[in-house]
Design a protein with these regions (language model features):
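Auxiliary alpha/beta "docking" domains used to position bulky ligands
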Residues: 14-208, 256
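Iron-sulfur cluster-binding cysteine motifs and their immediate structural context
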Residues: 38, 214-238, 244, 258-282, ...
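C-terminal amphipathic alpha-helical segment
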Residues: 249-283, 307, 311-315, 321, ...
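Amphipathic alpha-helical scaffolding segments comprising HEAT/armadillo-like alpha-solenoid repeats
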Residues: 306-308, 335-347, 366
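Short coil turns that connect the paired helices of HEAT/ARM alpha-solenoid repeats
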Residues: 315-317, 345-353
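Positions within the helices of HEAT/ARM-like alpha-solenoid repeats
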Residues: 322, 353-355
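Conserved hydrophobic register position within alpha-solenoid helical repeats
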Residues: 326, 358-359
Length: 366
């Protein structure tokens, strides 16, 4: 956190200032953000009561699975001024990430290949965006000569999609993703909380999903309980990234060759015809992760996993879950001597979690 004030944070009255000076500053901030690689910026206040009620209902239903951290911070997630006292404005920034990569559907139709969610085939976005947000906050502070700023990138209790929707960057769609009508949904979000009152962006957009339900029916594991409601416990992204233990057997075959994340509900969304290829070199595929060979990935040692995925968001799931996920994909692959040999090489792995999923995978080839 970059602080200017010492002692108690300054009091900021929760009002949007619309004087000419601050309006010019907003335009300047947009210009600076564009120079730093952001495609859009929105400004909003801290009133998120509607989203707070929705979040609590979702948590009460248990849809978060083992993600206990979703409810760990009480109302700080939906009340920015409780998380960072003095906050009265949230600056929401969008950075597009769609890489120039192998066609996703082609990869998923090739059972001996592994599918990695397109946001994760390049470098970890957290450090990239956090650094850019810090630079943006510094420029604002230098311009004003005062103020307090704190940047967040998917690593703190922040309702980032709610904030982005409220700031006019898009609408939360039936697949619970944020969609921008001119850019689709292949983008990252980052926020700057500040005690500087700034004019708010245009009111949040209406939802433009209409009668379309492509995302709901495309989900391989039927994770959508209803439009706008996701049961994370059935979501492949949750199962391959957040879930620590054994993957439910009734979901394994449905996972296909998706070894890290899932993009199906975005791939079928009509709005993503407007998504453009990112110009960020760091989001370009590394180690052929846009079209990897499952057997090759499964052969990696733990040292190779750590070395080759250094700087990748995949690394944080750890080697054990990496092997678990690939074992499931190998179980769903077309039978071949190569597949069987790879699985048998891990039959006696030190991890009971890996052994369990290898055993299941081998049973699929009998």
């Amino acid at each position: 956190m970059r602080r200017v004030y010492l002692g108690q944070p300054p009091i900021c009255h929760n009002v949007a200032v619309n004087n000419e000076e601050h309006s010019e500053l907003v335009d300047t901030i947009r210009h600076w953000a564009a120079e730093l690689g952001f495609q859009d910026v929105g400004f909003t206040g801290i009133e998120l009561e509607e989203h707070e009620a929705y979040l609590q209902k979702w948590l009460d239903a248990g849809y978060q699975g083992t993600m206990d951290w979703m409810g760990r911070h009480g109302t700080k997630r939906s009340r920015p001024s409780e998380l960072v006292p003095g906050t009265c404005t949230v600056i929401s920034c969008r950075m597009d990430y769609q890489p120039e990569a192998q066609d996703a559907w082609q990869v998923m139709s090739a059972s001996k290949k592994g599918f990695v969610s397109r946001y994760a085939v390049g470098r970890d976005y957290h450090k990239i965006i956090r650094s850019r947000l810090a630079k943006l906050a510094d420029r604002i502070r230098q311009e004003l000569g005062s103020g307090e700023f704190r940047a967040f990138v998917d690593s703190a209790p922040v309702l980032e999609r709610a904030v982005a929707e409220q700031s006019g960057l898009g609408w939360i769609a039936k697949n619970t993703m944020l969609i921008n009508e001119s850019a689709g949904s292949y983008f990252f979000l980052g926020e700057i909380y500040t005690d500087i009152p700034l004019p708010h962006s245009n009111p949040k957009q209406e939802k433009h999903c209409g009668s379309c339900s492509a995302c709901l029916t495309a989900c391989p594991t039927d994770a959508f309980v209803a439009p706008f409601v996701l049961d994370a416990r059935r979501c492949i992204s949750y199962l391959t990234i957040e879930h620590e233990g054994s993957i439910a057997e009734d979901l394994r075959a449905k996972m296909g060759n998706r070894i890290y994340g899932c993009d199906d509900c975005q791939l079928v969304c009509p709005w993503n015809k407007f998504a453009t290829i990112s110009t960020e070199p760091d989001f370009a595929p590394r180690w052929d992760l846009d079209n990897p060979n499952l057997v090759e990935l499964f052969s990696w040692t733990e040292d190779q996993f750590s070395e080759r995925l250094q700087g990748s968001p995949i690394r944080r799931i750890g080697y054990e879950k990496w092997l678990r996920n690939i074992a499931v994909a190998l179980g769903n692959a077309e039978t071949s001597p190569e597949i069987l040999q790879a699985l048998k090489s891990r039959e006696n792995h030190a991890s009971s979690l890996v052994r369990e999923h290898v055993s299941w995978a081998l049973s699929q080839h009998n």
